[in-house]
Amino acid sequence: MGKNSRNTKSLIGVLACAAVPLTGWAQSSSLQIYGVMDLGLSSYRAEGAGSRQMLTSSGNQASRIGFRGYEALGDGMGAGFDMEAGLNADTGTGQVSNTNNQPSGATSNSSGALTFNRKSFLYLRSQSLGEIRLGRDYTPAFWNMFLYDPFRVGVGMSAHVLHGTTVTSFRASNSVGYLSPGCSGPGCKGLFFQGMIAFGENSGGPDRQNGRVYGARAGYGGKNWDAAVGLATTLNKAADDYAQYNAAASYLWQDHKFMVLVGENRTGNRIATLDNADRVRFWQLGAVWKVGAAGNIPMSFMRLTRNDASGSSSQKYAMGYVHNLSKRTALYGTYTYVDNKGSINLPVATGSLSGPIPVPGGNASGFDLGLRHSF
């Protein structure tokens, strides 16, 4: 009994000694697992194509799982990483990624394997000089489309205005990025700047520059208002490059937020599958109206025009309600109506949420009713 007691005391002593450096390490480093599960019932309709009912993922926030880590290096310096994988929460499968910012780089994901398609980067940060990022990340032009959209995802989102290629409309692989101080998160403070260059990593030939991305974003983030301009260009010989330009602003009045977004997406060559268009121009008005202590009403109106042979246009109306049951859990509902004119036939939603495709000039509508939980 005495021997066991002595052994126990020795073990406790060893663990106590070992805990000293571990405690010091824990004070300067962190590792976090985070994510969102978002599932809802959806019904989408399109003129000339019938309707579709389904269980969908990401109606209010994108379903995802991520891992991030950080180490303080001293003197205001730090290093870290962030890896985030998109989830099809309704089926338990992962989503596709892209390796070279070109259609040829789309990953095959027939098995539904997990990929860190949303972001996968390593960074070095200085409080006074800013942050350098290496890896797969959001393009500078994407942030205005996301931050100034009251819905951001689901049937209400504004990203249905894409033209040309969607490979780099949101993210780019093989990138080197810079973010000015105060701009490491989605919301930047004070005067700020973001820049990116990404590589298609082709070995040679006439298409060796394909997939190279150049992007920049600049603006100001204040207490009650902010504004920014963004641009990005993806080199592509067949389309004579793909360019995005946008500008946006928001104003917070009491607990209510108002947003405006304008932009243009263009290709150097006209695209035959888009009725020989080479340009889409759009603008959006949006708001998030606070209701009581736990609710808010997002709403938006977007209009786009396409310079095709038919002079096509589309208008999108969206309204929803989000009721927070707690800090991490919410119920939501969103309704959207899309009014297409000419040869354009935008569905009510795109991507994994895509509804039926209407006939050219046909209307589309749909709703999401769901539950979202973050961790």
Describe every region a protein language model picked out.
Residues 1-30:
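Cleavable N-terminal export/targeting peptides
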Residues 28-43, 52-200, 210, 219-223:
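Outer membrane beta-barrel
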Residues 211-324, 335-337:
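Detector for outer-membrane/organellar transmembrane beta-barrel domains
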Residues 31-39, 75, 79-83, 132, ...:
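Transmembrane beta-strands of outer-membrane beta-barrel proteins
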Residues 323-325, 337, 359-375:
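Outer-membrane beta-barrel "beta-signal"
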Residues 61-65, 118-122, 172-176, 214-216, ...:
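Hydrophobic, lipid-facing positions within transmembrane beta-strands of outer-membrane proteins
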Residues 41-49, 87-93, 140-144, 201-205, ...:
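Gram-negative outer-membrane beta-barrel proteins
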Residues 50-54, 106-108, 162-164, 203-204, ...:
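Extracellular loop and loop/strand-boundary signature of outer-membrane beta-barrel proteins
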